[in-house]
Design a protein with these regions (language model features):
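Autoprocessing Asn-cyclization modules and mimics
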Residues: 110-189
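Glycine-enriched, solvent-exposed interface loops adjoining structured elements
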Residues: 1-113, 150-151, 168, 186-333
Length: 333
């Protein structure tokens, strides 16, 4: 698939240069691109709510005109699963990239823990001290979580694809960094007996814990969002009962933010930047191709404000309003 970010940048520069509005540097473009993508991403949820209201009012379409289905597919593409690392007795850090929490599950059945052997590559997990086959508990389909506290990929999850030997597994995704200071600790969890942890308010948890009849237990655990520590405030959860402390057993399913776009380049002898898709920090937009026009319009608006060129901002706004008008149904008919 062709790079969306390069097409968007070329179009933005073409429009901006047509009337001598000024040059947009790669660094400035990346800043505008990040904000534009965030604006559109957050608007998905407002659109979803709006179309649900229209559906209830029987003014939405079906089949190819089912806008809600398309929005759900886009939002679901940002769904992620990640194990939570506990930073206190029952205090767990939420993922850095979470936008909203879908659900948090408790995996009570731990089948194996260990430390990766240096040299694990690709989608393989090698632990020279493990006993995957003879132990008889590890099986394909089980969840494996990176439990390294403070690691580069801490909390990253994957599934066991196959048990290759006593010391080697094939996993669906390599969420471990096996350098000399890499992420090496893991936990393997059975998918049987998984319990959803119910979210409750700070006020409700006080009353639940005040009576032995309502206190959360392992069969009906609960969590409070926004428990604080000396590092993070509002990006943690407190899980009850306090006995749920085993690393990797609390797993979140959430909608993440899109990754920051980054138009990367190599500098030519004349000083002109040349698009370089092979750069290690290259990142395309994560939005669907259908949002390419929206990205262009929003970036033009930000660029116009930056160079104090009101006509460029107005052009982007006018194009965006035109698109919104075409996409909105006429509710008065």
């Amino acid at each position: 698939m062709a790079s969306i970010i390069n097409t968007v940048r070329a179009t933005v520069l073409s429009i901006a240069n047509k009337n001598n509005y000024g040059y947009i540097t790669p660094n400035d473009f990346n800043l505008y691109a990040k904000q534009a993508q965030l604006d559109i991403f957050e608007d998905y949820f407002y659109q979803y709510n709006s179309w649900i209201v229209k559906q209830n009012a029987r003014v939405s379409g079906s089949d190819y005109a089912d806008i809600i289905k398309g929005l759900v597919e886009v939002i679901d593409s940002f769904s992620s699963t990640k194990g939570l690392i506990n930073t206190g007795i029952n205090l767990f850090d939420l993922p850095d990239d979470y936008y909203l929490i879908d659900k948090i599950n408790y995996y009570p059945n731990l089948t194996a823990t260990g430390t990766l052997t240096f040299g694990s590559i690709g989608n393989t997990l090698i632990d020279s001290a493990a006993n995957f086959i003879n132990g008889g508990q590890v099986a394909p389909g089980q969840l494996i979580v990176n439990t390294t506290a403070g690691g580069l990929y801490s909390g990253g999850s994957a599934f066991v694809v196959s048990v290759d030997s006593n010391t080697q597994l094939t996993i669906s995704t390599n969420n471990f960094f096996t350098g000399s200071f890499g992420d090496t600790s893991y936990a393997i969890l059975s998918t049987k007996g998984v319990t959803e942890i119910e979210r409750v308010s700070q006020n409700k948890i006080f009353y639940l814990n005040s009576s032995p009849l309502t206190t959360p237990g392992l069969s009906f655990p609960a969590y409070v969002l926004g428990g604080a520590n000396n590092i993070n405030t509002g990006n943690t959860i407190t899980v009850y009962p306090e006995s749920i402390v085993t690393a990797g057993t609390v797993v979140s399913q959430y909608i993440r933010y899109p990754k920051d776009p980054n138009w990367t380049y190599a500098t030519l002898a004349a000083g002109e930047p040349l698009f370089d898709e092979s750069a290690s920090d290259y990142q395309d937009f994560e939005l669907p191709l259908s949002d390419q026009v929206n990205l262009i319009n929003k970036i033009l608006q930000y660029a116009g404000m930056s160079i104090r060129e009101i006509s460029l901002t107005q052009f982007g706004q006018a194009q965006e309003q035109m698109d919104d008008t075409q996409q909105s149904p006429n509710l008065t008919s």
